[in-house]
Swiss-Prot record:
UniProt protein name: DNA-directed RNA polymerase subunit beta
Protein role: DNA-dependent RNA polymerase catalyzes the transcription of DNA into RNA using the four ribonucleoside triphosphates as substrates.
NCBIfam families with a match to the protein in the record: PRK00405.1, rpoB
GO terms, biological process: DNA-templated transcription
Taxon lineage: Bacteria, Bacillati, Bacillota, Bacilli, Lactobacillales
Coiled-coil annotated residue ranges, if any: none
Subunit note: The RNAP catalytic core consists of 2 alpha, 1 beta, 1 beta' and 1 omega subunit. When a sigma factor is associated with the core the holoenzyme is formed, which can initiate transcription.
Reaction catalysed by this enzyme: RNA(n) + a ribonucleoside 5'-triphosphate = RNA(n+1) + diphosphate
Length: 1198
């Protein structure tokens, strides 16, 4: 027997064909969300407050300090928040200290700081009753970047940019004349020496002393001449910079100094963030820049005078490691003192080394390092600016290297915690201005923190972020895999990111640093391709937001691959050689071959085993979760694998799902971490279990109660239903499944079913990827799903009186009211179809001035005789089903409703959808198709043992698409079904060809895995042997019921008076320019005329046509369409005297748009008006009679 058994949870064993020993379990798959939010609550929020506070008033007599904060218990539970359309949030209280510096008085007070949304255990937020996800954003990291560009003459020039987290950019560039310029905040360029002089190094000699003598420096110094002898060089430089930044304003050295300090050296205006400081220190540090360079002067220990490195030594990694402590210390440190007129007058500490130029052995080049400022320094320093200029000048000498912006060492992830912190910071900085003003205006004696703090800017910023940010998304809840993928999504779009239109091919492309960090397969097709990515299965964020991936360390001395795990970011990995996970190992852990496949800086090739530093932990670390669920992924073309990964996320949860016979072993972990199942929080024993709740008694005697969700509506309108897995007496451990979620079976992801599939054509019905299906799949509810739709109706106060929910609806027969209760609300369990009343509601109508008799009637009979119109909630077009639940919210019951709303009724309708012709189905290999025919079981081809086939697919769909994985799955699936086992074939480490055929043989199948099929209609065998097996097929969310649409009478656009478009608006089908040509070509003038008039925007024509059709009269001639009138007005507005004449040369009056339109009515629907008018006339006649009778009766009674 090939393979070995692996236990997944307590309910499933699979035969696994993997050969690689996994040394590291998958991390929790939603930790990117939960860890980030936890870090935000633990210290991120505190850091934001400490960034903005303390705040002083303008005279510096008062100061407001931050002390601490406390988050209390949430107001609602999760379930209550969902039901009441509320947010799951907790009140936050912040303690402030107000210090009066004149009197020394201190007031400490706790201030309510609004409700803050709290993340659920599943990594989601509940905002206004809807479950949302904050998608992590992929952005360019702050730091310093160098690039090269070739001009039209083929000359290479360089550029560099310092990009902060927030603040002004500082750029350097060289031109064709080898002069180096700098730009501050994208303004006009100035020679870079001007900025050096402004930093306090004004003399030409000083500049040559710092940077050394190079052509770029010399040319720039010559260009930067002293124009105004009245000013010192520093003052002149400052004024020149001020003129660039504030053109047209009077320039003084002092104003320029304060402007530059504000732009670059004020922590409130300029922030590199921890990550920016880390990246700058890493790039400008001398250790990385000296690597593999030849030193030109001996390196001497400043304390002892000992020569550490002789001149002419090549600085290999080992040499640098031997003097690392000296490099981090005072070795070659030089302190420069700027002159008194400088922007920053503190001494500038640099590290200066001289090396031999790589391009010319006779030249010496100066390398300046920024001497590693402390990590706490969040602004750029003069030392950073000088070191950046030095790196820039070194590039022209062949030292250093330019950066690749798409390298994942230069792109980082902003997860939910950081995105929230930025929003709070934004709100606090708006609040700061407000606080400062109130401190200055009000009387110091009576001020308290509560009085000067207005929390509205902060709560508004947070609310806006959750409600309308591009990164706050309605959770994709089709199935647990789509939830999980959504939580792990990385988007390059959003505020501060890229835009679709401006993103080129390079940004979207797969980069070698994606390996183990971002999935190269799973990304949307269409305009977002490559901009929206997914975290790889082992991917993990470090404290700076860079994605790390785990590797097994190789002991270089012994050659043993250890079980020690090291997490590396992309730029750390560039320094090493990494072997692939499927490299063969001996028993003692050494490599079995002398040469192994590995990679170093993106070069994939064979490397000697003795130079390998690390080895991958698992073959599936390359791909994301959804991709890792595709068996035989290694046999599929990547384009089709992309579709397969994406389509699994669109699978509809079925009534009784089956886990795949051929899985990858990923199904268990994906289901476990998705948040859709119920997982035991503690060890214990089950004491009670039914469909609604499970009770587990812990060992310490306390009781855990787990509530099971039954048929809740998911965000996607599918049924979110959980099924209990345990029974009384079961012992459960922490992390065990207590209940399956939707699309799960026995603790594994189960998106579809395992039908018997044959690759054969049948009567041409599977042309173009269509799917032929057996009626058994319909009858046995194999592909049946439940869909829940929510409808709501609310009663409001109107000018004419309140609306009311009632059973007494005008002009509605008793038959339509049969399922309504005495309030007028549908009963639970009622079967409804389109047009049925769900909630009876009437709205008062406007009345004319009443006559004396009518007033008398009102006085006698109350409001019964008032005119009302029917505004009931009805089942919309194309919907039907069974009423699953009704929820009623009223102010009387203490429910929070919007202002003006008195009552809200929600009706949930469940719809059972069997699979039908027109539904879309797919396998896991991108093999998708639409059901074209459902054939009776008896007509389907059958196997020699009489088993009919369930599905027939077109064999022509395989070769050109190159997704051969489906054929492998087919054969292995049949073997698994015959043997009664489940199989795991992990990606890149699955069943080999030998495993496949030995399993086929074990199952007793024919050696070619094909079989003879017999025609169900005739009983004759088909000519050729056919590949028949079991393939995992899923039903996708694109169902024909949601797409079918027809319009008879419907709404029109207010402006153009043409029918609206789309199913949601109950719109018509667009008859475009080309379709008009087609009718013109056939000379179908009458058809064309009615399409362009009655059916479109001839307002009077369509009214008359409607009337004529209802009364059975001939349809009158059409009039002038509205769009023609618009054209005439357009030409008239251009000054052309254009009029329309009839055959007698009389001018035709075109009605004005305002005529016949009620100003209050935004949505004009003339046909509805005509209907209503007819109904009103009939009703008025009927009511006049009734009123007469009533008067007579009243008179009689008197």
């Amino acid at each position: 027997m090939a393979g070995h058994d692996v236990q997944y949870g307590k309910h499933r064993t699979r035969r696994s064909f993997s050969r690689i020993k996994e040394v590291l379990d998958l991390p929790n798959l939603i930790e990117i969300q939960t860890d980030s939010f936890k870090a935000f609550l633990d210290h991120g929020l505190k850091e934001v407050f400490e960034d903005v506070l303390p705040i002083s008033n303008f005279t510096d007599t008062m100061e407001l300090e931050f002390v601490g904060y406390e988050i209390k218990e949430p107001k609602y539970t999760l379930e209550e928040a969902r039901i009441h359309d509320a947010s799951y949030s907790a009140p936050i209280f912040v303690t402030f200290r107000l210090i009066n510096k004149e009197t020394g008085e201190i007031k400490t007070q706790e201030v309510f700081f609004g409700d803050f949304p709290i993340m659920t255990e599943m990594g989601t937020f509940i905002i206004n009753g809807g479950e949302r996800i904050i998608v992590s954003q992929l952005v360019r990291s702050p730091g310093v970047y160098f690039n090269d560009k070739v001009d039209k003459n083929g000359k290479v020039g360089y550029g560099s940019t310092v990009i902060p987290n927030r603040g002004a950019w500082l750029e350097l560039e060289s031109d064709s004349k080898d002069i180096t310029y700098t730009r501050i905040d994208r303004t006009r360029k100035i020679p870079f020496t001007t900025l050096v002089r402004a930093l306090g190094f004004s003399g030409d000699d000083e500049i040559f002393d710092i940077f050394g003598d190079s052509e770029l420096v010399r040319n720039t110094v010559e260009k930067d001449i002293h124009k105004n002898p009245m000013d010192s060089r520093t003052d002149e430089a400052l004024k020149e910079i001020y003129e660039r930044l504030r053109p047209g304003e009077p320039k003084t050295a002092e104003s320029s100094r304060s402007l530059l300090v504000a732009r670059f050296f004020d922590p409130r205006r300029y922030d590199l963030a921890a990550v920016g400081r880390y990246k700058i220190n890493k790039k400008l540090n001398v250790k990385t820049r000296l690597l593999n360079q030849t030193i030109a002067e001996p390196l001497v220990d400043p304390e002892t005078g000992e020569i550490l490195v002789e001149a002419g030594t090549i600085m290999t990694r080992s040499v640098i490691e031997s003097i690392e402590s000296h490099l981090d210390g005072d070795l070659n440190k030089i302190v420069y003192i700027p002159n008194d007129a400088a922007v920053v007058t503190e001494p500038v500490v640099l590290q200066k080394f001289k090396v031999v130029a790589p391009t010319d052995p006779d030249r010496v080049v100066t390398i300046i390092g920024n001497a590693n400022p402390d990590d706490k320094v969040r602004t750029v320093t003069p030392a950073d600016i000088l070191a950046e200029m030095s790196y820039f000048l070194n590039l022209a000498e062949g030292l250093g290297r330019v950066d690749d912006i798409d390298h994942l060492g230069n792109r980082r992830i902003r997860a939910v915690g950081e995105l929230l912190a930025n929003q709070v910071r934004l709100g606090l900085s708006r609040m700061e201005r407000n606080v400062r003003e109130r401190m200055s205006v009000q009387d110091n004696e009576v001020l308290t923190p509560q009085q000067i703090i207005n929390i509205r800017p902060v709560t508004a910023a947070v609310k806006e972020f959750f409600g309308s940010s591009q990164l706050s998304q309605f959770m994709d809840q089709h199935n647990p895999l789509s939830e999980l993928s959504h939580k792990r999504r990385l988007s390059a779009l959003g505020p501060g990111g890229l835009t679709r239109d401006r993103a080129g091919y390079e940004v979207r492309d797969v980069h070698y640093t994606h390996y183990g960090r971002m999935c190269p397969i799973e990304t949307p097709e269409g305009p977002n391709i490559g901009l929206i990515n997914n975290l790889s299965s082992y991917g993990h964020l470090n404290k700076y937001g860079f994605v790390q991936t785990p590797y097994r360390k190789v002991d270089r001395e012994t050659g043993v691959v250890t079980n020690e795990i090291v997490w590396l970011t992309a730029d750390e990995e560039d320094e090493y050689t990494v072997a692939q996970a499927n490299s063969r190992l001996n028993e003692d852990g050494t490599f079995a071959e002398k040469i192994v496949m590995g990679r170093h800086q993106g070069v994939n090739q064979e490397y000697p085993a003795n130079i390998v530093d690390y080895m991958d932990v698992s073959p599936k670390q390359v791909v994301a979760v959804a991709t890792a669920c595709i068996p035989f992924l290694e046999n599929d073309d990547s384009n089709r694998a992309l579709m397969g990964a994406n389509m699994q996320r669109q699978a509809v949860p079925l009534i009784n799902p089956q886990a795949p016979y051929v899985g990858t072993g990923m199904e268990y972990q994906a289901a476990h971490d998705s948040g859709a199942a119920v997982i035991a929080q503690y060890d214990g024993k089950v004491t009670y279990a039914d469909a609604d709740k499970v009770e587990v008694r812990r060992e310490d005697g306390s009781l855990d109660v787990y509530h099971i969700q039954k048929f809740r509506r998911s965000n996607s309108g599918t049924a979110y239903n959980q099924r209990t897995l345990v029974k009384v007496g079961d012992v459960v451990e922490k992390g065990d499944f207590i209940a399956d979620g939707p699309s799960m079976e026995n603790g594994e992801m189960a998106l579809g079913q395992n039908p018997i599939v044959a690759y054969m054509t049948w009567e041409g019905y599977n042309f173009e990827d269509a799917v032929i299906m057996s009626e058994r799949l319909v009858k046995d509810d194999v592909y049946t799903s439940v869909h829940l739709e929510e409808y709501e109706s609310e009663t409001r106060d109107t000018k004419l009186g309140p609306e009311e929910i009632t059973r007494e609806i005008p002009n509605v027969g008793e038959d339509a009211l049969k399922d309504l209760d005495e309030m007028g609300i549908i009963r639970i369990g009622a079967e409804v179809k389109e047009g049925d009343i769900l909630v009876g509601k009437v709205t008062p109508k406007g009345e004319k001035d009443l006559s004396a008799e009518e007033r008398l009637l009102h006085a006698i009979f109350g409001d019964k005789s008032r005119e009302v119109r029917d505004t009931s909630l009805r089942v919309p077009h194309g919907a039907d089903g069974v009423v699953r639940d009704v929820k009623i919210f009223t102010r009387v019951n203490g429910d929070e409703l919007q202002s003006g709303v008195n009552m809200l009724v929600r009706v949930y309708i469940a719809q059972k959808r069997k699979i039908k012709v027109g539904d879309k189905m797919a396998g896991r290999h991108g093999n998708k198709g639409v059901v074209s025919r459902i054939v009776p079981v008896e007509d389907m081809p059958y196997l020699p043992d009489g088993t009919p086939v369930d599905i027939m697919l077109n064999p022509l769909g395989v070769p050109s698409r190159m997704n051969i994985g489906q054929v492998m799955e087919l054969h292995l699936g049949m073997a698994a079904r015959t043997l009664g086992i489940h199989i795991a074939t992990p990606v890149f480490d699955g069943a080999s060809s030998e495993d496949l055929w030995s399993t086929v043989k074990e199952a007793g199948m024919d050696s070619d895995a094909k079989t003879i099929l017999y025609d169900g209609r005739t009983g004759e065998p088909f000519d050729n042997r056919v590949s028949v097996g079991v393939m995992y097929m899923i039903k996708l969310h694109h169902m024909v019921d949601d797409k079918l649409h027809a319009r008879s009478v419907g709404p029109y656009s207010t402006v153009t008076q043409q029918p609206l478009g789309g199913k949601a608006q109950f719109g018509g089908q667009r008859f475009g320019e080309m379709e008009v040509w087609a009718l013109e070509a056939y000379g179908a003038s009458n058809v064309l005329q009615e399409i362009l008039t009655y059916k479109s925007d001839d307002i009077n024509g369509r009214l008359k046509a409607y009337e004529a059709i209802t009364k059975g009269k001939p349809i009158p001639k059409p009039g002038v369409p509205e769009s023609f009138r618009v054209l005439v007005k357009e030409l008239q507005s251009l000054g052309l005297d254009m009029r329309v004449l009839d055959e007698d040369d009389q001018e035709v009056e075109l009605r004005d748009l305002d005529e016949g339109m009620d100003e209050d009515v935004i949505h004009v629907d003339d046909l509805e008006k005509a209907r209503e008018k007819a109904a009103q006339e009939a009703k008025a006649a009927f009511e006049a009679e009734e009123a007469e009778k009533a008067t007579e009766e009243a008179a009689e009674q008197e």
